[in-house]
Amino acid sequence: NLNFDMRALRTTTEKLYGKGKRFLTSEYKDIELMCIWSFACEVLYSRPSFINFIDKYNLMTEKGNPLTNAEVGYRYISGDLEFEEAHRGLQDVEIECQILAKCFAQKKKHESGILGNPWSIVAKYNKEKKEI
C-alpha cells in the first residue's frame, strides 16, 4: 500500500528531522513510484482464477468485496491456504517480492504511482463476472 507507506515515511521524516523536512526531495521528483497492491489488483487479482479462489475460500470483506491484501495474495500464488502474514518488516517484504514477481510475469500493462482504493478494481471485476 504505497499510499500508506508514503504517509508513514513523511510522518517519520518530520518526527526525526523536524516539520517541513521532506522524505523525497526535489532531486528525486522524476522517480517512478509503483504500488505493489495496485499492480496486483490490476494484473493478478482481476483474473478469473483469483475470483474463483476467493469465492471458493470465502475470502471476502464484511461488505462482500474480495480481500486483496498481501496475505490473501500470497495464499493465492503459493497455494498455502494456512499462510498468515507476519506483519514484520523483512518477512512482509519477502512475500511482497514474490507477489511483485508474479505480477511482472503476467506481462500486462498497469498504472504507475498510487491508485486510490485499488481493491475496487477487483470488486468491479468480481461484480461484472457474477452478472454474466
Question: What are these language model-derived features?
Answer:
Residues N1-I132:
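Metal-dependent phosphoesterase core characteristic of DEDDh/y 3'-5' exonuclease domains
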